[in-house]
Regions:
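A cross-taxonomic marker for long C-terminal extensions/tails that follow the last structured domain
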Residues: 179-180, 191-231
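Well-ordered, non-membrane alpha-helical segments in soluble/globular domains
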Residues: 22, 109-116, 145-152
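Two-metal-ion acidic nuclease core segments, chiefly of the RNase H-like superfamily
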Residues: 148-164
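RNase H-like two-metal-ion nuclease catalytic core shared by retroviral integrases
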Residues: 143, 165-187
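Charge-mixed, compositionally biased segments that are often intrinsically disordered regulatory tracts
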Residues: 1-67
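Extended hydrophobic secondary-structure segments that form protein cores and membrane-embedded regions
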Residues: 41, 130-137, 165-170, 204
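Electropositive, glycine- and tryptophan-enriched low-complexity nucleic-acid-binding patches
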Residues: 67-134, 138-139
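Short, flexible loop/turn elements at secondary-structure junctions
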Residues: 29, 44-48, 89-91, 137-139, ...
C-alpha cells in the first residue's frame, strides 16, 4: 500500500458521433476560411481575483524583493473578480479579450463577440457576410442556453452577419483552439504576478505569433509559437 493521487483515466462513454462532429467542425472552419469569412474560437478564461492574492508560478524580480501576497486567499466582497472572455481569430492568428466585472453570462459572451467585431472584425473582414463561432457545449455559450441563442440573433440583426455556431462535443473543451492559441499565453504572462489593478486586464489583446497559425485549422492542433501583448 502507498499514498497515491486520484488519476482520471476515463472520461465516460465515447459516443460514436464524437469523431464525426470534430470532422464536421473542422470542415466548417476550412470552408469559411476558403471563402474569406471569419472563423473564431471563443471561451471564458478562469476568473481572476483582483488584489494581492497568490498566483502560481515564478518570474524575475530584484534579488531580495519578492512580491508580497496575502496569507489566505479569502475573497474580498468589495473587490470584483475579473472575468476574461476571449475571441481567437483562426485565420489571422489573433486574439482579443474582453474583461467583465461580475458574472459570466450569455449576454456578456455575445457582447464580447460584438465588441470584437466592432474593434477588429469589421476592419479585418469588410466584405464578410457570414461568421462562424466555435465554442464548447457549456458555460455562458452552452448549446442549451436560450439566452445565448436570443443574444446571437440580436448580434446577427445588428451586424447583418449570418451567424453559424459549431459546438464541440461535451467534455472536449480542452480541444477548443482558443485554449492553446490564446489562453495558454495569457497564463504564462500572468504567472507569478498579483493582479492588483484591474487596468492590467481591461482591453487586453494578445497576439499569438505561431509559424503554423495561419494554416493550421484543425480544432485539435496545438501551437508551439510565442506570444506578444499589444495595446
Amino acid at each position: 500500500m502507498s499514498c497515491a493521487n486520484l488519476k482520471t483515466l476515463e472520461e465516460g462513454a465515447n459516443h460514436p458521433d464524437r469523431g464525426r462532429q470534430f470532422r464536421y467542425l473542422n470542415n466548417q472552419v476550412r470552408r469559411f476560411l476558403r471563402a474569406g469569412a471569419p472563423a473564431i474560437s471563443v471561451d471564458t478564461k478562469k476568473k481572476e481575483l483582483i488584489g494581492r492574492y497568490y498566483n502560481p508560478g515564478r518570474r524575475w524580480r530584484p534579488q531580495g524583493k519578492p512580491e508580497k501576497v496575502r496569507v489566505h486567499d479569502f475573497i474580498d466582497p468589495e473587490e470584483p473578480k475579473a472575468v476574461p472572455y476571449g475571441v481567437y481569430d483562426v485565420a489571422r492568428n489573433q486574439g482579443w479579450v474582453n474583461v467583465g466585472r461580475d458574472h459570466d453570462t450569455a449576454s456578456f459572451a455575445v457582447e464580447s463577440i460584438r465588441r470584437w467585431w466592432s474593434a477588429l472584425g469589421c476592419e479585418e473582414y469588410p466584405e464578410a457576410r457570414q461568421l462562424l463561432i466555435c465554442a464548447d457545449s457549456g458555460g455562458s455559450n452552452g448549446y442549451r442556453l436560450r439566452l445565448w441563442k436570443v443574444e446571437l440573433q440580436a448580434l446577427a440583426d445588428d451586424t447583418g452577419l449570418g451567424v453559424t455556431v459549431g459546438h464541440l462535443p461535451p467534455g472536449t473543451s480542452k480541444w477548443n483552439k482558443i485554449e492553446h492559441r490564446l489562453f495558454s499565453y495569457i497564463s504564462m504572462n500572468w504567472r507569478g504576478r498579483c493582479q492588483t489593478d484591474r487596468s492590467h486586464h481591461d482591453q487586453d489583446r494578445i497576439k499569438s505569433q505561431s509559424p503554423i497559425g495561419q494554416a493550421q485549422v484543425s480544432l485539435e492542433g496545438q501551437s508551439d509559437g510565442r506570444s506578444d501583448a499589444f495595446a
